């Protein structure tokens, strides 16, 4: 009896001096609840106003004590206020176990429930407590129809005993017939069986076996802080299902609720963090995360395809199918015509993020308007509602006569007029049927985006099989080859990116298919057209910039493509162009008789390790982004270097060549008349002495003369990735009289430190003709989109490499700097720096440890049930004291397991929150780096949303640290206190080893450093 006597003596000392409180035993002395309130008031007088309590208010006193202990101290309520009223003699073992938790807490030890309860915010203090004592109805269990209080934050705690009085009077149970020592509310809310003390789990006012308290969806045992209530009473679900922990990348992030109007799928896996959102995340944000994560918090990646169907001019549907799971809901967008202003948004998210330097480049397009069944292996990240800024948006305009799968028509008012002018320009002569009609042209500066499509890391072979099927354009942002073929399509497809300054045009009329592609960071337009005599070849320019012209065929990708052109077609197209673009024709920089040749071919040499007929366009376009400092001149068939590439250009007898210039960037040349309003005109073919290199050198316009504002705008343009291609050489030749020869030689391996402002050395820029191979280039290839790049700000650190000094600001570089990790080599997936941390625990390992704890708890409960039966049978015997010590030890072991489980859950949450924070930080920096004058209202709104999510994520992480610190203060002396108690009882027991979790120790040390 020593253990019980010792605990009883401790209670007597704590309650000494309090009115109406006398501790003479461990049963009836606690029935009125004043003893519990007295113990709490002695240690925490701020929590209870003891002077207002009355001895006769049994229900109110017990309810107040249980509620305060649970919500403020984290001590789970093993007792119920109704039981204390209904039973003349309360259950002795229950009171002993419950009071022992008071003892443990106020002696620096965690309560039996672990850490979860401490994190719970205080509940409403306006509950009606009066009117209970005078009622005489018998005790009864809470019914499912009872009004339930709104669920508590799952990221903070386990919901426990909480009843919403709602202003109504709930009858207080009076003494009911029953055996002494039994508990009225001891029936599990799921299985209906008796719940032993060691098995008790209270949630939302109902009692459960811990093993019965499982997720309705995945049937996993619900863990502290990782579940949430549903609308159905007594039903809970995981905020983060264990099956999704190992398969879903937290970067998908969680981020919740991207741009308004975006198509989002809410599956909510990241409940504990990033959403735990958290999204993660937190309901994700961690936004997304991704899939919001997630999903409400995270993002899932499913293999599927995007298919848009063109309905009669009323509605259009976007189907997002998944072969790995159920299809997402169909989104219907109402449209009125092929030039409708309705927008169809398909948002995307990538499990590896958009900042991967090895997978994206400024000239890449994630456009996959129509994908045939053969291309269904394309990855379609399933949608956290990621912001449209993370993907290249594409507008698609289709003729309504398409009978098969067609792209949804969606044009904004600012884009429709420009596109109509382009359609008119690209239509066949009057003798041939025009695929679409276009009203009067009207130039515009930018083309809005409508559809975003995901990043693909697998080969994409896209075909448009039969006639009247729109052209298929796929240009993934990965380094995987892409083959584009459109044999007999009669419907024009226009693809444009929102941030492009000038268009890159691909006109393929051999099959009467018109494709227009705008590169997002293109400065000089490139027109690639292939004609068979039915369509004119005309130079087109956006905002007055001068294009270079190359010809190829969209019907077939071959090493050499040649087709004759007709003079009448050229004249007709030029007349249309002059009407649509008066700034270009008015400047006098291009005459009808001097238009570029209509028949030419393109052949590009790719690295020797590439496979023919499959050209990764991101590598080609990425070559031009390394060193943007160069000047432009004209030489006949003269090879010169462009940044880190050597280029041969020949068009008839006029060949513009591009060579690097130290410390300068000439974005254009000035012939007899400069293009009005254009800061960076491209090279124009001129006759006479202007053809020589001397004439062009004399007319070079240094970049230093540009206004600071103009330079700043160009520098601010984001480049999503930094290409890495070494020892590649590209050469183009033609079988026609007028051809374009292109040789691209990378000098990436020559990267070395150099002083600020200096240019690349001649040795570093020399071409390497020994590594050249001839490969076909797809018609959608943009070989000159990034020849001209803005001059970056000079670096103060002179030891930086030339490439870093000349590259514009990149989100991936900023993020890498923040994460203290280098860029991944080509072809490798980008690993989050959080995962590289020495104390990072993979989700698989976390789940394994949680399963181990689950098994130990199950075994512990079996022991506890047997020990409880022995204790009840031995009440008053000499063996009771020994059994009670064993009982306290068992409760302590359970306490340690629950604490370890809680730490693992918080560890998982913190890791997801950290990844979510990094994602938010990268996107937020990119938006904040954008000049205020260029920010749209959506950008400003998105910036505020990200800022709010970022602050919430940081606060959540800070809360986790605070909670852990509070618990550690009590846990430090826990084992010693238990040993001291046993020794005071006169029992010689071997000290048990503590298996406290050490998963936070390394992180704490690194944080202090």
Swiss-Prot record:
Q: PANTHER family, from UniProt?
A: CALPONIN HOMOLOGY DOMAIN-CONTAINING PROTEIN DDB_G0272472-RELATED, MICAL-LIKE PROTEIN 2
Q: Which residues cross the membrane?
A: none
Expression by tissue, per the entry, reads: Detected in brain, lung, liver and kidney (at protein level).
Which portions of the sequence form the region Necessary and sufficient for interaction with actinins?
261-393
Among the GO molecular function terms of this UniProt record, one is:
metal ion binding
Q: How does it assemble?
A: Interacts with RAB13 (GTP-bound form); competes with RAB8A and is involved in tight junctions assembly. Interacts with RAB8A; competes with RAB13 and is involved in E-cadherin endocytic recycling. Interacts with RAB8B. Interacts (preferentially in opened conformation) with ACTN1 and ACTN4; stimulated by RAB13 activation. Interacts (via calponin-homology (CH) domain) with the filamins FLNA, FLNB and FLNC (via actin-binding domain).
The record's section on SMART domains has: CH (SM00033), DUF3585 (SM01203), LIM (SM00132)
> For the modification Phosphoserine, which residues carry it?
110, 143, 153, 249, 766, 768, 832
Known InterPro entries for this protein?
Answer: bMERB_dom, CH_dom, CH_dom_sf, F-actin_Monoox_Mical, Znf_LIM
Q: Where is the Calponin-homology (CH) domain?
A: 1-107
Q: Where is the composition biased (Low complexity)?
A: 731-746, 755-769
Residue span, bMERB domain: 833-980
What is this protein identified as?
A: MICAL-like protein 2
Which segments carry the region annotation Mediates targeting to the cell plasma membrane? 261-805
Annotated stretches, region: Mediates interaction with RAB13 and is required for transition from the closed to the open conformation: 913-1009
Q: Where is the LIM zinc-binding domain?
A: 186-248
Its record classes its membrane topology as: Peripheral membrane protein
The GO biological-process annotations, alphabetized, read as: actin cytoskeleton organization; actin filament polymerization; bicellular tight junction assembly; endocytic recycling; endosome membrane tubulation; neuron projection development; Rab protein signal transduction; substrate adhesion-dependent cell spreading
Positions of region (Disordered):
114-180, 247-268, 348-447, 655-834
Note the coiled coil stretches, chain numbering: 841-880
User: What is this protein's function?
Assistant: Effector of small Rab GTPases RAB8A and RAB13 which is involved in junctional complexes assembly through the regulation of cell adhesion molecules transport to the plasma membrane and actin cytoskeleton reorganization. Regulates the endocytic recycling of occludins, claudins and E-cadherin to the plasma membrane and may thereby regulate the establishment of tight junctions and adherens junctions. In parallel, may regulate actin cytoskeleton reorganization directly through interaction with F-actin or indirectly through actinins and filamins.
- Reproduce the free-text note on domains from the UniProt record: Exists in a closed and an open conformation due to interaction of the C-terminal coiled-coil domain with an N-terminal region including the calponin-homology (CH) and the LIM zinc-binding domain. The conformational change is regulated by RAB13 and RAB8A. Adopts its closed form upon interaction with RAB8A and interaction with RAB13 causes conformational change from closed to open.
């Amino acid at each position: 009896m020593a253990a019980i006597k010792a605990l009883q003596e401790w209670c007597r000392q704590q309650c000494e001096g309090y009115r109406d409180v006398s501790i003479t035993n461990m049963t009836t002395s606690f029935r009125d609840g004043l003893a519990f309130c007295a113990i709490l008031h002695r240690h925490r007088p701020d929590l209870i106003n003891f002077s207002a309590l009355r001895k006769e208010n049994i229900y109110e006193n017990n309810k107040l004590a249980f509620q305060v202990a649970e919500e403020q101290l984290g001590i789970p309520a093993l007792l119920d206020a109704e039981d204390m009223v209904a039973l003349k003699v309360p259950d002795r073992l229950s009171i002993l176990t419950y009071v022992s938790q008071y003892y443990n807490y106020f002696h620096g030890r965690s309560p039996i429930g672990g850490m979860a309860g401490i994190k719970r915010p205080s509940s409403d203090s306006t509950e009606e407590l009066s009117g209970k004592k005078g009622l005489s109805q018998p005790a009864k269990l809470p019914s499912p129809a009872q009004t339930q209080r709104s669920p508590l934050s799952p990221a903070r705690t386990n919901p426990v005993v909480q009843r919403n009085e709602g202003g109504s009077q709930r009858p207080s149970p009076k003494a009911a017939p029953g055996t002494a020592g039994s508990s009225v509310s001891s029936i599990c809310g799921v299985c209906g069986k008796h719940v032993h003390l060691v098995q008790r789990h209270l949630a939302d006012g109902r009692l459960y076996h811990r093993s019965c308290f499982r997720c309705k969806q995945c049937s996993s045992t619900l863990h502290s802080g990782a579940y949430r209530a549903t609308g159905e009473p007594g039903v809970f679900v995981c905020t983060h299902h264990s099956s999704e922990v190992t398969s879903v990348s937290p970067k998908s992030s969680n981020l919740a609720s991207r741009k308004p109007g975006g198509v989002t799928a809410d599956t909510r896996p990241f409940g504990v963090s990033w959403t735990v959102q958290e999204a993660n995340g937190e309901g994700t944000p961690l936004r997304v995360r991704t899939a919001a994560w997630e999903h409400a918090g995270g993002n899932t990646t499913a293999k599927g395809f995007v298919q848009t169907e063109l309905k009669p001019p009323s509605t259009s549907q976007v189907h997002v199918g998944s072969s790995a799971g159920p299809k997402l809901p169909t989104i219907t967008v109402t449209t009125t015509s092929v030039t409708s202003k309705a927008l169809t948004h398909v948002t995307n998210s990538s499990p590896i993020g958009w900042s991967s330097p090895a997978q994206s480049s400024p000239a890449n397009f994630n456009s996959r308007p129509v994908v045939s069944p053969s291309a269904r292996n394309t990855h379609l990240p399933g949608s956290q509602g990621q912001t449209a800024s993370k993907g290249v948006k594409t507008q698609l305009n289709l003729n309504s006569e398409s009978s098969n799968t067609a792209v949804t028509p969606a044009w904004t008012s600012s884009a429709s007029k420009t596109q109509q002018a382009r359609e008119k320009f690209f239509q066949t002569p009057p003798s041939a049927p025009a695929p679409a009609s276009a009203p009067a042209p009207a130039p515009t500066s930018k083309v809005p985006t409508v559809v975003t499509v995901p990043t693909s890391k697998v080969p994409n072979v896209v075909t448009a099989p039969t006639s009247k099927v729109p052209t298929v354009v796929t240009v993934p942002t990965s380094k995987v080859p892409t083959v584009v073929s459109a044999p007999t399509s009669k419907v024009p497809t226009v693809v444009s990116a929102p941030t492009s300054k000038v268009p890159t045009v691909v006109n393929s009329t051999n099959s009467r298919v018109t494709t227009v592609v705008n590169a997002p960071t293109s400065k000089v337009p490139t027109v690639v057209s292939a004609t068979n005599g039915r369509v004119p070849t005309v130079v087109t320019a956006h905002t007055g910039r001068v294009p270079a012209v190359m010809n190829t065929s969209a019907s077939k990708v071959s090493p050499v493509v040649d087709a004759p052109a007709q003079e009448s077609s050229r004249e007709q197209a030029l007349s249309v162009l002059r009407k649509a673009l008066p700034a270009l024709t008015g400047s006098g920089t291009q005459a009808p008789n001097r238009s570029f040749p209509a028949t030419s071919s393109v052949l590009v040499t790719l690295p020797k390790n590439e496979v023919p007929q499959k050209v990764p366009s991101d590598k080609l376009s990425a070559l031009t982004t390394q060193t943007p400092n160069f000047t432009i001149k004209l030489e006949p068939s003269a090879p010169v270097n462009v940044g880190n590439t050597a280029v041969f250009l020949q068009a008839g007898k006029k060949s513009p060549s591009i060579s690097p210039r130290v410390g300068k960037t000439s974005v254009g040349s000035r012939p007899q008349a400069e293009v009005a309003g254009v800061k960076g005109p491209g090279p124009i073919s001129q006759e006479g002495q202007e053809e020589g290199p001397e004439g062009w050198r004399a007319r070079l316009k240094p970049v230093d003369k540009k206004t600071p504002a103009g330079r700043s705008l160009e520098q601010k343009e984001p480049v999503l990735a930094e290409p890495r291609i070494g020892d590649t050489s590209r050469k183009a030749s033609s079988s026609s009289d007028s051809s374009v020869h292109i040789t691209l030689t990378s000098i990436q391996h020559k990267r070395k430190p150099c002083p600020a402002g200096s240019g690349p050395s001649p040795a570093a820029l020399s071409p390497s003709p020994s590594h050249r191979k001839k490969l076909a280039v797809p018609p959608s290839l943009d070989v000159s989109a990034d020849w001209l790049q803005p001059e970056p700000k000079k670096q103060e650190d002179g030891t930086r490499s030339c490439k870093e000094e000349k590259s514009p600001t990149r989100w991936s570089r900023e993020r890498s700097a923040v994460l203290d990790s280098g860029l991944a080599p080509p072809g490798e997936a980008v690993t989050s720096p959080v995962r590289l941390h020495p104390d990072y625990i993979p989700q698989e390992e976390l789940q394994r440890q949680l399963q181990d704890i689950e098994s130990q708890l199950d075994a512990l409960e079996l022991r506890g049930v047997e020990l409880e039966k022995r204790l009840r049978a031995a009440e008053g015997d000499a063996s009771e004291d020994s059994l009670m010590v064993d009982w306290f030890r068992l409760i302590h072991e359970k306490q340690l397991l629950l604490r370890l489980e809680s730490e693992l859950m918080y560890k998982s949450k913190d890791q997801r929150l950290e990844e979510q924070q990094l994602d938010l930080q990268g996107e937020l920096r990119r938006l904040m780096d954008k000049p205020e004058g260029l920010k749209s209202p959506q950008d400003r709104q998105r910036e505020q949303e990200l800022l709010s999510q970022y602050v919430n994520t940081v606060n959540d992480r800070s809360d986790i640290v605070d909670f852990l610190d509070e618990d550690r203060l009590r846990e430090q002396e826990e084992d010693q206190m238990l040993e001291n108690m046993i020794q005071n009882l006169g029992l010689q027991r071997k000290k048990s080893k503590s298996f406290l979790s050490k998963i936070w120790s390394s992180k704490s040390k690194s944080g202090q450093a």
